[in-house]
Amino acid sequence: MASLAVQDDAMAALGGVSPLIRSGRIGDALSRLAAIEAGAGGDARLLQHLGEHYTHCGKPDAAARCYRRAVELTPDDPRCLYNLSAALIALGRIGEAEALLDRVIALDPQDADAWQNRSTLRRQTPGSNHVADLLKAVERVRPGPAEVALCYALAKELEDLGDPHHSFAWLRRGADRRRSLLSYRVETDVAAMAEIARVFGARLFDRPSAGCPEPGPVFVMGLPRSGTTLVDRIISSHSDVESLGEINDFALALMRLAGATGGKGDLIRRSADLDPAALGRAYLDSVAGYGRTRPMFIDKTPANFLYVGLIVRALPNARIIHLRRHPLDSCYALYKTLFRMGCPYSYDLGDLAAYMLAHRRLMDHWRSVAPGRVLDVEYEALVADQEAVSRRIIDHCGLDWQDACLTFHENTAPAATASAAQVRQPIHARSVGLWRRYADQLEPLAAALRAGGVDPAELV
């Protein structure tokens, strides 16, 4: 009974970690997790939960350690195997992860997430793919999330095999089903971005703003799937830089200082009146908990484009890099990605067009009111002339050039994004112009972008 009591105490202690993570107190959370892990012993359930919490703290190495111990204790538990595979993907151990997912599917053929994750790990080939098995699996599945995952897996593998017609048909089915499961109105996000631009007008930037004077971080931002992970890896291959990945610390610091609000509009209006120095300090105090070991760090949270007006006032020494990509390639890359959370606008072409147009308007606004603060990087230019554009990026960060920035694919740091497998490869142009394979299917999207003011020359 004593051991059961100890286990109950450990689970209770673990319950106190989640609020720390949600509030951005990562350092405190990691300290508690380490103490709980030290006493975890042979409790596979506790080790599983520890791994999940480490993952939420952006520590896939620690998560993998816990999941591996859990797998040793319960080697035929599909959940343990799946979670270990996810941690190994973030660590770049793609072959091991694929083998684990093979085991998951053998043990539990109904695990649609395992099918979908496995499809993304490499380019499928005529001699090595899972299309036939996926077609059988999708015939058996009920409408819902599992159907969505299998449809996305089929779309990915058929695209790899050079069958764009059937690939897009499965993608549309999966996206339509996912959209039907969401309660989301893109108009809310569009209105919020317009309100941000209104509140953070030119007059606000005329006010004196000391901000937090410490050397600032590098913010890499843009729409997801626009090349943010690639640029993050290029910069973090420098010996003076490490990446914290996609964290929410700036938004969390903002919400803590703003206090309880009456919704997005109220938060936006309150944020303009915050003390910039206090906001900058709150953010830097929060990220200190990640235990950095290098002088400079990267915050690669794509949605930070919403906060550029706050960032430049709160952190006057911050470096901001914004990724841009051909509008149709950008939207197609979003549309074909099954996000575990976030990006609810990405499952409908009309929503995608509306969100992209609002994003472009807001970025145009930031360039107008804070000229020179944002370095725009064109994904296509980076792919076409890697060294020249990489040097411009490193220079913008105030760093001396290092050749390691050209071999970013050898960077062993974790990458826990949808591009985790791709950034382990040298730069390539396979995805440039990929939208052209689907020009007919994407024409409604292109028409909406043209109607929204995008120069038709950008859409060819």
Give short role names for the model-derived ranges.
Residues G211-R313:
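Phosphate-binding active sites in nucleotide-utilizing proteins
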Residues L100, Q116-S119, V131-P143, C151-P217, ...:
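PAPS-dependent sulfotransferases, especially Golgi type II membrane carbohydrate sulfotransferases
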